[in-house]
């Protein structure tokens, strides 16, 4: 699957358009990143801030609050610590 970095406005548009199969909150190195996955297009959109840095959250609750604020009610949580991956579907 191809990964594209997109800004906040485009990420929000993906949420509103319904063109996303899954939203993923993934933990890397102690912080949380967001992805919007479009399987039909074979693209995973990675949220990036305007200045080019990756947008991150320090807690899962903060990332969940952001997603809720843009209208996302269900997302998948993945933890990548110590080479173990866990998947947890959360609905809010």
Please state what every model-predicted region is.
Residues 25-51, 77-82:
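Short aromatic-glycine-(Arg/Gly/Cys) micro-motifs in beta-strand/loop hairpins
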Residues 2-35:
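Short N-terminal "domain-start" leader segments
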């Amino acid at each position: 699957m191809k990964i594209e970095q997109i800004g906040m406005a485009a990420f929000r548009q993906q949420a509103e358009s319904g063109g996303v199969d899954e939203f993923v909150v993934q933990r890397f190195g102690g912080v949380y990143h967001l992805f919007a996955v479009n399987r039909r297009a074979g693209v995973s959109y990675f949220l990036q801030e305007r200045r080019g840095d990756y947008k991150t959250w320090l807690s899962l609750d903060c990332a969940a609050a952001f997603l809720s604020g843009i209208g996302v009610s269900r997302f998948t949580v993945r933890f990548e610590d110590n080479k173990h991956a866990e998947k947890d579907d959360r609905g809010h």
